[in-house]
């Protein structure tokens, strides 16, 4: 049975697709694992209310998202913490509005990445890890360049795969992605696009 929960946390931000998957952690006491549900949070660019088939889309189907929705909770009224992507993600993972979160713009660093979120920032990832979860992010990060304190591996994210720099995420054929702190070169995209 599908549960639809109305909540005004975050609006879907443009030019961004990230899936935050948080799963129960091994090595915690068995009772705690049973008490902790799996959490899969999908934040997608420009996704309108009726753009998913279980919410009325009839020009194409989204069977995998529909199945996830039928087995869990669906939040249908998310509002962005900011009008631009990095601050919006920062608001989402810190629970703060843009007046308090450190990331207030899409400020870029010279080589690759955005202004880093300080490593002592309390985030949903730290909160979930304190409660026996493993945390993962797949998609666009943009909250700290590689090898900075804002990189996913320094923000309590156990597994990351995707775009560290949001500018590179805007290219259809990116030259590389990141798997944790390892740069993965996409050889097939080399001649199609420049980062």
Write out the residue ranges for each language-model feature:
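Formylglycine-dependent sulfatase
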Residues: 2, 12, 22-195
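Sec-dependent signal peptide recognition
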Residues: 6-15
């Amino acid at each position: 049975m599908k549960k639809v929960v109305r909540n005004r946390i975050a609006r879907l931000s443009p030019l961004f697709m990230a899936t935050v998957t948080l799963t129960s952690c091994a090595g915690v006491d068995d009772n705690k694992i049973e008490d902790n549900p799996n959490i899969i949070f999908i934040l997608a660019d420009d996704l309108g209310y009726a753009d998913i088939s279980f919410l009325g889309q009839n020009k194409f189907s989204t069977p995998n998202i529909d199945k996830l929705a039928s087995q869990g909770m669906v939040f249908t009224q998310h509002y962005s913490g900011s009008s631009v992507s990095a601050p919006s993600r920062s608001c989402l993972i810190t629970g703060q509005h843009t007046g308090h979160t450190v990331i207030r713009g899409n400020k870029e660093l010279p080589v690759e990445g955005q202004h880093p979120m300080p490593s002592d920032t309390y985030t949903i990832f730290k909160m979930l890890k304190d409660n026996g979860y493993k945390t993962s992010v797949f998609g666009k990060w943009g909250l700290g360049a590689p090898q900075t304190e804002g990189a996913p591996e320094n923000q309590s994210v156990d597994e990351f795969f995707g775009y560290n720099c949001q500018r590179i995420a805007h290219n259809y054929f990116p030259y590389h992605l990141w798997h944790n702190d390892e740069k993965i070169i996409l050889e097939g995209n080399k001649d199609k696009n420049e980062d």
